[in-house]
Amino acid sequence: MVLKVFKDHFGRGYEVYEKSYREKDSLSFFLTKEEEGKILVVAGEKAPEGLSFFKKQRAEGVSFFFCERNHENLEVLRKYFPDLKPVRAGLRASFGTGDRLGITTPAHVRALKDSGLFPIFAQQSVRENERTGRTWRDVLDDATWGVFQEGYSEGFGADADHVKRPEDLVSAAREGFTMFTIDPSDHVRNLSKLTEKERNEKFEEILRKERIDRIYLGKKYSVLGEKIEFDEKNLRDAALVYYDAIAHVDMMYQILKDETPDFDFEVSVDETETPTSPLFHIFVVEELRRRGVEFTNLALRFIGEWEKGIDYKGDLAQFEREIKMHAEIARMFEGYKISLHSGSDKFSVYPAFASATGGLFHVKTAGTSYLEAVKVISMVNPELFREIYRCTLDHFEEDRKSYHISADLSKVPEVEKVKDEDLPGLFEDINVRQLIHVTYGSVLKDASLKERLFKTLEQNEELFYETVAKHIKRHVDLLEG
């Protein structure tokens, strides 16, 4: 009834997102789109308390309040519809869909809504926010508007990813994030850079702080029939790599506990040069438990290469053997999931990963959704794509420094020589994928490129949503077997 009245009287100027329509307490809420952008419309006798609106019109006895999509109005929506507030994933199998543009969540909803995976629709790292100029509030609000637009009400999480500093942790907690991924990589030691003498000296320093040798030496474990025991050498090496990192994680955990009572806590130890051995995995878990750190997810450094935006590079059979060991350790200790970072496009490993973990997993993606967005640009606005491509070439060497990739610029095609209809095919080239993947910040800092990129995606919204949704669903289907 309300939508019909609205369309009859205002339909020419507004496109209604019908899936967004909700009713509560004699009020109707829905999203519309006009030439200037998206607008929240609230229909009822009077506006809800706290709602700000720029226009009020009546039709057939119904008052329509036209509102900006801002934080204050979203807070009003959250009061009426608590499912628009993020919640914990807990030990449910979960999937993170980072959105660097802030407009991609409707596609992510479509990919995940009928799956058995709990969605983390709001997920960005500190690094991503710095490069895109966004805040924790922007990330959570943008995702929530997308959830509202699609009429999704089954619950979602919000992950403050790769947090290193206490101030970033606190600000994300105060914005309502429900998951926090701690990156202690600045405190992880690289064993290959230490001589035997240096290793022994630094281990003695640790022992002067705490006699962990008395806790671990001689401790034995059996994992899938393999005997694992702490001896002086492997305990020394485990402590050298992880002891300080775990102390940092503990400090961050205590700060977070003072801010919010209930949250998912992910510990990321994947930023090491060498893969996490079963014994190192055991040491990390034992130390976290000993300190009272309650963690939901643990991200390990697996064998092989986990580069951004492309499939796994490595020995699949060896990975399968290792993930079975790690999954068994997780089952042995109980109470946490194994998390896969740089999870975008790792299609070849998903079946083995999901099977070994028995559904006790979390997978993170982010860059792949941005790649699909730029791919849509290549389909519908070839000249803009060529400008973006040239921008990525100009900034690649600087932007690549903080990413683990192997892209070779000598192997990327000259975009001027590629026909318009062949541009989308460039996204099959791993060098092009990584070129575009890591330079998003430089592209989005170019005001002209950013404005035209967003305008093009808005003008081709359904193609954009369906392209991203199809790609993310490919991940989901392989994880669900």
From Swiss-Prot:
**Which protein family is named in the record?**
Belongs to the UxaE family.
Kindly give the HAMAP family that the UniProt entry links to this protein.
Answer: UxaE
Question: Which positions in this protein are listed as binding a divalent metal cation?
Answer: H162, K308, H341
Temperature profile: Optimum temperature is 60 degrees Celsius.
Q: In the UniProt entry, which residues are flagged as the active site?
A: D161, E266
- Full protein name: Tagaturonate/fructuronate epimerase
Any matching Pfam family: UxaE
Species of origin: Thermotoga maritima (strain ATCC 43589 / DSM 3109 / JCM 10099 / NBRC 100826 / MSB8)
Q: What does this protein do?
A: Catalyzes the epimerization of D-tagaturonate (D-TagA) to D-fructuronate (D-FruA).
List the keywords (alphabetical). Answer: Isomerase, Metal-binding
Instruction: Tell whether rRNA-binding is among the UniProt keywords.
Output: no
Q: What class of enzyme is it?
A: isomerase
Reactions catalysed, as given in the entry: keto-D-tagaturonate = keto-D-fructuronate
Q: Which cofactor does it need?
A: a divalent metal cation
